[in-house]
Amino acid sequence: IFQMNLDCACSGMDQRKVHMLAREAAPKLGLPPPVCLHNPLLPSLQITEANGSFDDNTNINASIKHKMSKSVGKGALWINDTSQEIREKYRQAYCPQKVVTGNPVMDHAHMLVFPHYHQLDIQRSSKYGGNITYHSFEELAKAYGKGDLHPLDLKNGVSAAVTKLIQPVSDYFENKPENLQAMRRLQVTR
């Protein structure tokens, strides 16, 4: 923060402790304390857990432990993933039936889909109840918790919505393949 001469640091909640340390140290270094903005962390689509304790707040600690990480390829979504890659990652995602809390697919619906679209469309065969639209996360959570929505239907619906959400980025990379290659060089996995 100080080396880059930043007035404001933006990051995930996992950087909160170091940012608070920077705010405490700034006056001692004769610098203004930076403004720090922290975003919630998207959970990994796979069951992963980092070792250690990261925050005194148990909810923040849990979100850091289960965060999406570029080092776990199948658990992380990349902005340059193809629609097929996104669909496959969601298809393989941890998504326990009737479990709302601690379910990464439900978390993605809550954090990605509803803020942008204010609804989640589920396309399914009439054999399985036909198409359905959930107009709020609360409505989705209630239905999923009761078992009215199958995990595969949830995965397919969230996958379609996330694919639509990043379509402008997909279009950009399709028109600028050299930038797509540069982005892929930055992707480091285990």
Where are these regions (language model features)?
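Conserved alpha/beta enzyme-core scaffolds, especially Rossmann-like or related mixed alpha/beta domains
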Residues: I1-Q15
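Conserved nucleotide- and phosphate/pyrophosphate-binding catalytic cores
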Residues: R16-R190
